[in-house]
Curated annotation (Swiss-Prot):
GO terms for molecular function: ferric iron binding; ferroxidase activity; heme binding. Residues 1-145 form the Ferritin-like diiron domain. It comes from the Bacteria. It is an enzyme of class 1 (oxidoreductase). Belongs to the bacterioferritin family. This is Bacterial ferritin. Its main location: cytoplasm. It is found in: Cytoplasm. It comes from Neisseria gonorrhoeae. Forms a bacterioferritin (BFR) complex with BfrB. Heterooligomer of 24 subunits, arranged as 12 dimers, that are packed together to form an approximately spherical molecule with a central cavity, in which large amounts of iron can be deposited.
Length: 154
């Protein structure tokens, strides 16, 4: 099936972001493991798997629309401690959210409602799961302090 070229091109941009998010979560999860924060490792490892699924969904759709997936990822923002990792991941999620909203608008203009629905589902996951959880963690650190938070993540 031949898809709208602007939609395919934009999906490749989104794919680049998903690949970067996956790799960033991968590195951060391994940092958490190295630092002994088992709960953070488990959560970020789960997020990495979800980002991999998002990337796979985009790859499948790009192929279905007759495009070629571009596997170059966007730049990573790697933290050096728990707080900077959480903040970097939250910033990445905000960027993904904004990009998905633009993509949804583009799909509506191109009348590609199947791709739009794919992006809407990923936007829901980004806002309600990923970004929300990261915001909660940063809020907890503010409320109970870093030491108490770190202890809760062992």
């Amino acid at each position: 099936m031949q898809g709208n070229q602007a939609v395919v091109d934009y999906m490749n941009e989104l794919l680049s972001g998903e690949l970067a998010a996956r790799d960033q979560y991968f590195i951060h999860s391994r940092l958490y493991s190295e630092w002994g924060y088992t709960k953070l490792f488990e959560r970020l490892n789960h997020e990495m798997e979800e980002e991999t699924t998002h990337a796979e969904d985009f790859i499948r759709r790009i192929l279905m629309l007759g495009g070629t997936p571009k596997m170059a990822r966007a730049e990573l923002n790697i933290g050096t401690d728990v707080v900077s990792c959480l903040k970097a991941d939250l910033q990445t999620e905000y960027e993904v959210r904004d990009a998905l909203k633009k993509g949804i608008k583009l799909c509506e203009e191109a009348q590609d409602y199947v791709t739009r629905d794919l992006m809407v589902a990923q936007l829901k996951d980004t806002e309600e799961d990923h970004a929300h959880w990261l915001e909660q963690q940063l809020r907890l650190i503010e409320l109970i302090g870093e030491g108490n938070y770190y202890q809760s993540q062992l």
